[in-house]
């Protein structure tokens, strides 16, 4: 930042002899520059503290560049640029920058935007967007940048982050999730081994594009994944640029195979393969064991792996086959003598006859009509082309098969996942000394991604601000629409002209194609050519810079022809894997696609279609951008070259992004969705209702006004100080005509208040529910008690009624029996009274009454037993035991009672046939009953019941018949 000069420094310079004093002028300038430099150095010391480039003032390319350099020198490699994260590749391992502890810290924080810039900030924000279910729910993280900027490493770290944070607390569920996450992570080394290679600009350059969808269930746990690949650079199998290498898997095999594997695959340690250049360079990616373990975890067993490596070894031997020029054009070219062995080994590994292999490589089959077949020997260059075509076709099919197998093992069923987070890793922008169709397609993909970024964050935001009435100073940005139209536009573009040449199937040299391009596309400013180059070429002005493309062989590469006889050769192979890769059912399709009169889908058309489907997915998701920056071309650690970084910053539109994001509102929600989601925040007295009933009753204008008033009510509840008189124009929120524009901080405030309101209302609902449940349980308990009381009362009444009926019957029967017994007893008593009384009184008079009383008093308190046999009639005992007699005896005085006892005992003693046990405790008769033979112990405890201690046993005596029945009844 420059400062105005002070008054003291604004002096007129002195003049000597009519000339200005240059020395004083120099001192004057040096002082002002010194002040400016001092201020600049102070600011420069603080530049590394700026986490967000939008806070740098002024926002210019120079200040942004200085800020990134200061942070890079301080060991800080991530910086926010508004809605984008800028990642500068350190080119060295950084301690604990990607550890699991750091991942958990970013995941557990309450405010990810408040943390230090990191790729985990972007990952966590996307993860929380899925949790909040704000439309669009699905997320995409687009990792872009030049080759070697760190895109592949960033994608790998993002996958590890999601595998770490999606773990479940449940042991069983967590074990299943970890198994799925392990398979998803194992797909990385396999895909990198077969799809990455060492180039001039990157040791681990992705030679294919991939879009990985991490599938999440309702609990936001990874249940599976799917991989989509784009445009594998299969030409690298047979053609490697100087100082570059083939795919990693070939070097892993050659360096990591065991002795037995080398013998089986015919890979001697000192072998020299023309398709395996620069194998002496040892790279971190040359780890064969990691690749084999990952393949095993993905369901590719050991025999299948062995089969794959045999085929790859066969391709290496196939590349060593060299042909000699034929002396006679009618004779096919023969392989050189020293390459005959390579042909035999290649045929053996591919399990095809060596004669068939050499024949199909050197002789072309021409079909004329349906049955006419001609064979024509090929020239040496054609033989080499057919050999390379065979290798490229096998490798491309093998790569597609690997992707299919990986998807079968990691992809979840559609019913098991609800949302996804996509990770896009495509080739970076490429510009080499010689560029052809591959670089044209790669740069076309980067142009489409840049257009998506521009349309999403720059153009769409400014257009939407203007449409919604947001006060906004428009910013000029670099629009690449003209370049995209040049490549894919309709009706005339570079791709359309290339496809037309392929459809015409005519021999057209590169110079003629160059003239067609210049004449047809001269109106577009993005195309040109190098007039000083002898080779036909054209130059395209991409967003990242100008690139010169060579036209030679471009049309032929676009056709990507595969001779049908080569497909037939592979279909005849005895190898099981090759039979899967080239099924016989495709024979007719192959003939139709390679017929001389018809051309199949071109490479450009196929790539354009797959890219369009990818862009549709990106447009349907919420995108997040990570811009990877390569600080130097040499990939040296902690080396920051401003010129190279500046080119990348300008190319990807970082400065324009910062300008818009600094004063912009990245989150836009319609009034209807806003009120629907945040209506719970409004105070109770506002009585807010949902806006959906207004659709049928009111017009759109009245509905919008009502929604706007409700929206203001909600915002006033969140920001009461900032919101005055329904005017919401501040740094946090702005209300347009149909949408509300929010910053991330405002969304966090709204979500926090919404969570508090939902928690409060949930607690209220819980309290109401609990009280309702308690009242319901009380009512149910009371009702159950009432029912139980009624049932018990009914049962009791029924039982009492039954008992009363039974008692009445028993009472009636007993009364009849009693009357009958009393009558019988009275009749018998009348007959035997005279004999008994005479005997009794005679014995009683023999001893005085006093002796009787004394004997009574001298009786011990124990049982007195005397034996007697009843002889005087069957009713004698019954008479004594009859109720009337008992009553009579009990009611008599003491003397008569004693007399009666003695009379009975004497009579029984005289008969000497029955034993009677008498229990006496006090005056009066306690018990007198006949008992069965054997000892019976009587207890003296008094019972309130009469005759409660009488043993009801059967009397084994001469009492039988009716008297026995009467005795039992009496007992």
UniProtKB/Swiss-Prot annotation:
Residues that coordinate or bind ATP: 145-152
Subcellular localization(s) per the UniProt record: Mitochondrion outer membrane; Cytoplasm, Cytoskeleton
Chain segments annotated as coiled-coil in the UniProt record: none
Keywords for the protein's UniProt record, in alphabetical order: Actin-binding, ATP-binding, Cytoplasm, Cytoskeleton, Membrane, Mitochondrion, Mitochondrion outer membrane, Motor protein, Myosin, Nucleotide-binding, Repeat
Record GO cellular component, one term: mitochondrion
Range of residues in the leader sequence: none
Region Disordered: start-end pairs: 1-25
InterPro entries: IQ_motif_EF-hand-BS (IPR000048), Kinesin_motor_dom_sf (IPR036961), Myosin_head_motor_dom-like (IPR001609), MYSc_Myo19 (IPR036035), P-loop_NTPase (IPR027417)
Bilayer topology annotation: Peripheral membrane protein
Role summary: Actin-based motor molecule with ATPase activity that localizes to the mitochondrion outer membrane. Motor protein that moves towards the plus-end of actin filaments. Required for mitochondrial inheritance during mitosis. May be involved in mitochondrial transport or positioning.
Oligomer and partners: Myosin is a hexamer of 2 heavy chains and 4 light chains.
UniProt free text on domains: The MyMOMA (MYO19-specific mitochondrial outer membrane-association) region mediates association with the mitochondrion outer membrane via electrostatic interaction.
Record-linked PANTHER family: MYOSIN, UNCONVENTIONAL MYOSIN-XIX
Name recorded for this polypeptide: Unconventional myosin-XIX
Organism: Xenopus laevis
Gene that encodes it: myo19
């Amino acid at each position: 930042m420059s400062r105005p000069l002070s008054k003291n420094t604004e002096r007129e310079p002195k003049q000597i002899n009519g000339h200005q004093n240059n020395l004083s002028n120099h001192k004057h300038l040096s002082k002002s520059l010194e002040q400016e430099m001092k201020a600049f150095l102070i600011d420069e010391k603080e530049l590394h503290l700026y986490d967000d480039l939008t806070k740098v003032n002024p926002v210019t390319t120079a200040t942004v560049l200085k800020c990134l350099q200061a942070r890079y020198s301080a060991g800080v490699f991530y910086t926010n640029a508004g809605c984008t994260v800028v990642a500068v590749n350190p080119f060295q391992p950084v301690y604990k920058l990607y550890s699991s502890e750091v991942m958990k810290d970013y995941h557990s924080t309450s405010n990810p935007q408040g943390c230090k810039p990191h790729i985990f900030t972007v990952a966590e924000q996307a993860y929380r967007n899925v949790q909040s279910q704000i439309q669009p729910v699905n997320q995409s993280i687009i990792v872009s940048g030049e080759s070697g900027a760190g895109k592949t490493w960033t994608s790998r770290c993002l996958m590890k982050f999601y595998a770490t944070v999606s773990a479940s607390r449940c042991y069983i569920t967590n074990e299943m999730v970890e198994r799925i996450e392990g398979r998803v992570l194992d797909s990385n080394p396999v895909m990198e081994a077969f799809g990455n290679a060492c180039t001039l600009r990157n040791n681990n350059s992705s030679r294919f594009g991939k879009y990985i969808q991490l599938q999440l269930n309702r609990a936001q746990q990874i249940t599976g994944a799917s991989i989509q690949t784009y445009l594998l650079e299969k030409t690298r199998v047979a053609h490697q640029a100087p100082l570059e290498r083939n795919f990693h898997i070939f070097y892993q095999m050659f360096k990591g195979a065991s002795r037995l594997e080398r013998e089986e695959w015919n890979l001697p340690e000192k072998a020299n393969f023309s398709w395996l250049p620069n194998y002496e360079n040892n790279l971190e990616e040359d780890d064969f064991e990691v690749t084999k373990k990952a393949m095993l975890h993905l369901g590719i067993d050991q025999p299948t792996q062995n089969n794959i490596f045999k085929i790859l070894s066969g391709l290496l031997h196939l590349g060593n086959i060299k042909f000699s020029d034929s002396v006679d054009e009618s004779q096919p070219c023969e392989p050189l003598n020293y390459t005959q062995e390579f042909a035999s080994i290649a045929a053996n590994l591919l399990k095809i006859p060596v004669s068939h292999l050499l024949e199909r490589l050197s002789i072309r089959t021409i079909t004329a009509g349906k049955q006419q077949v001609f064979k024509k020997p090929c020239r040496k260059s054609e033989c080499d082309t057919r050999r390379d075509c065979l290798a490229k076709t096998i490798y491309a099919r093998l790569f597609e098969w690997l992707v299919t197998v990986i998807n079968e093992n990691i992809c979840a069923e559609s019913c098991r996942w609800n949302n996804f987070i996509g990770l896009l890793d495509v080739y970076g922008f490429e510009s080499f000394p010689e560029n052809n169709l591959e670089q044209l397609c790669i740069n076309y993909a980067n142009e489409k991604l840049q257009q998506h970024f521009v349309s999403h964050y720059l153009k769409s935001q400014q257009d939407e601000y203007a449409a919604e009435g947001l006060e906004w100073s428009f910013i000029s940005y670099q629009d690449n629409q003209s370049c995209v139209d040049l490549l894919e536009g309709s009706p005339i573009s570079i791709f359309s002209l290339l496809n037309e040449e392929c459809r015409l199937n005519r021999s057209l040299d590169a110079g003629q194609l160059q003239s067609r391009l210049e004449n047809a596309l001269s109106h577009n400013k993005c195309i040109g050519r190098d007039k000083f180059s002898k080779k036909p070429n054209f130059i395209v002005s991409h967003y990242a810079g100008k690139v010169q493309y060579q036209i030679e062989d471009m049309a032929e590469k676009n056709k990507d022809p595969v001779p049908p006889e080569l497909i037939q050769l592979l279909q005849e192979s005895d190898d099981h894997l090759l039979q899967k890769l080239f099924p016989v059912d495709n024979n007719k399709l192959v003939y139709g696609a390679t017929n001389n009169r018809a051309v199949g889908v071109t490479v450009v058309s196929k790539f354009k279609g797959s890219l369009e489907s990818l862009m549709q997915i990106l447009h349907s998701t919420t995108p997040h951008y990570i811009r990877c920056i390569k600080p130097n071309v040499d990939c040296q650690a902690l080396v920051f070259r401003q010129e190279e970084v500046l080119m990348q910053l300008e190319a990807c539109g970082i400065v324009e992004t910062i300008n818009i994001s600094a004063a912009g509102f990245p989150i836009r929600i319609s009034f209807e969705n806003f009120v629907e989601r945040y209506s719970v925040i409004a105070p109770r007295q506002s009585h807010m209702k949902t806006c959906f009933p207004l659709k049928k009753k009111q017009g759109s204008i009245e509905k919008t006004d009502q929604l706007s008033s409700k929206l203001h009510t909600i915002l006033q509840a969140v920001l009461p100080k900032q919101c005055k008189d329904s005017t919401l124009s501040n740094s946090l929120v702005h209300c347009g005509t149909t949408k509300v524009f929010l910053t991330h901080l405002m969304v966090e405030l709204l979500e926090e208040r919404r969570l508090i309101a939902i928690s409060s209302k949930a607690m209220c609902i819980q309290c109401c529910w609990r009280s309702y449940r308690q009242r319901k349980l009380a009512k149910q308990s009371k009702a159950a008690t009432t029912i139980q009381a009624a049932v018990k009362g009914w049962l009791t009444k029924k039982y009492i009624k039954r008992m009363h009926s039974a008692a009445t019957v028993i009472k009636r029967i007993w009364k009849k029996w009693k009357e009958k017994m009393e009558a019988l007893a009275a009749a018998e008593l009348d007959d035997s009274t005279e004999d008994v009384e005479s005997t009794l009184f005679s014995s009683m008079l023999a001893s005085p009454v006093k002796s009787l009383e004394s004997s009574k008093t001298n009786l011990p308190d124990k049982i007195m037993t005397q034996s007697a046999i009843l002889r005087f009639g069957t009713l004698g005992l019954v008479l004594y035991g009859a109720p009337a007699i008992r009553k009579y005896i009990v009611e008599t005085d003491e003397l008569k009672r004693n007399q009666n006892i003695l009379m009975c005992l004497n009579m029984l003693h005289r008969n000497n046939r029955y034993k009677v046990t008498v229990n006496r405790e006090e005056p009066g008769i306690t018990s007198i009953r006949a008992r069965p033979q054997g000892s019976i112990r009587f207890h003296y405890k008094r019972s309130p019941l009469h005759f409660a201690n009488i043993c009801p046993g059967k009397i084994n005596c001469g009492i039988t018949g009716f008297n026995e029945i009467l005795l039992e009844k009496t007992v």
